[in-house]
């Protein structure tokens, strides 16, 4: 991953790098890989995340339609 440093502005380049890493999901991946996760725990977590996403989508849909 590359970030251009313009006019020796390292702070701005660092912010751009963090934003790129956030968009790519690198921080989340690092957090998940920090400890070993058993396959059964991984399936349970992914299932819970899918349910959460579905509920959120349904809530947004209902809010938009005005129910």
Swiss-Prot record:
Query: Keyword Ribosomal protein on this protein?
Result: yes
UniProt key word Cytoplasm:
no
A Pfam family found in this protein is Ribosomal_S21
User: Gene Ontology terms, cellular component aspect?
Assistant: ribonucleoprotein complex; ribosome
| InterPro entries found in the cross-reference section | Ribosomal_bS21 (IPR001911), Ribosomal_bS21_CS (IPR018278), Ribosomal_bS21_sf (IPR038380)
For this UniProt record, the keywords arranged alphabetically read as follows:
Ribonucleoprotein, Ribosomal protein
GO MF annotation: an example = structural constituent of ribosome
**Record's family?**
Belongs to the bacterial ribosomal protein bS21 family.
Q: What is this protein called?
A: Small ribosomal subunit protein bS21
Native source organism of the sequence:
Rhodospirillum centenum (strain ATCC 51521 / SW)
């Amino acid at each position: 991953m590359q970030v251009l440093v313009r006019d020796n502005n390292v702070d701005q380049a660092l912010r751009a790098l963090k934003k790129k890493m956030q968009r790519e999901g690198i921080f989340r991946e690092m957090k998940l890989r920090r400890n070993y996760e058993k396959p059964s725990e991984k399936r349970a977590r992914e299932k819970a995340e899918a349910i959460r996403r579905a509920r959120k989508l349904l809530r947004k849909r209902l809010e938009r339609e005005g129910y």
